[in-house]
Amino acid sequence: MNVGGDLVIRDACHADKTAMPFANVGGNVDLRGASLADIDLSGASVAGELRIDGQKLAACPKSSGDPDVLNLRNARVGTLLVADDALTAPRRLRLDGFAFARVGGFEGETKSQLRGRSIEWWDRWARLDPDYSPTSYAQFAAAFTNSGHRDAASDIRYLSRERERETACKESWLRGSCLLQTALGSVAGYGIGSHTFVVLRWVLVFWLAGAALLWLTVPAARHKGAIWCFCASLAQLLPVIPINKELTEFFNDPERTRLKGWQVFLFSALGVVGLALGAILLLAVSGLTHSS
């Protein structure tokens, strides 16, 4: 189907499938207020705006109680316009391969939808497609970046990775991909923007735990003072960063003159934890585990 101008389906009612795959529209497509049980715009090309809201015709009959379906797989539109009430109506989306250049407001509306809505709002809208597709999140991230909102772009990429993790863990939480994605997200925020700094929280927790263990259970360490205990704990937690040879040598006590066996084990484990945190951070920022 080829339409040179606008395609207005506003306030339409149709209980059966509306098939318009690979439609070529030179203007806008207006679906506001339309009650369409199943509209197929897969592969469509819209030069202008695709307008969507959550309004439905109350008197429009439906053949079933299932949510309406809007199929936008592999469709391309110039501008995506989604009304604030789009989350209120029962609807399912199909967004795999859906691409858009801009996100904006309805005619006469000057406030950008990107600035006026939270990142979580767009995440909920993307979740109207029960099947996770990274494409829609990547499109939103590009739109945020192009509008100068780089932090928001990082946030939407983070939510995309979170949904990727949820999808992997839904299949089986024992799968390697689920465990790896969980570690990358909880320890290093997937290496995305400011979310990466969550690793500092883990470093702080284990650093303070090691310092407290030295101060409370190792008399030789307590004798050297609290600051020394903090420095020694940090040196053991971050063995790849040389701080002071005296600090690292303190934990090398084969004669057990300073440390008991269980203490040696715990401080050795602290070093392993530090190496694990560093490895997870490196994997996260490298992007090697990001399949999308």
Model-inferred region functions:
Residues 1-183:
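N-terminal leader/targeting and pre-domain segments
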Residues 43, 74, 204-237:
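Outer-pore turret/helix-boundary of cation channels
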Residues 49, 194-198:
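Juxtamembrane interface helix immediately N-terminal to a transmembrane segment
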Residues 153, 213, 285:
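Hydrophobic, well-ordered secondary-structure elements that form the walls
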Residues 161, 217-218, 290:
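Hydrophobic/aromatic-lined pockets within catalytic cores
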Residues 177-195, 219-280:
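Pore-loop/selectivity-filter region of tetrameric P-loop cation channels
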Residues 199-211, 272-276, 280:
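Alpha-helical transmembrane spans of integral membrane proteins, capturing the lipid-embedded, hydrophobic core
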Residues 281-292:
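Juxtamembrane boundary at the C-terminal end of a transmembrane helix
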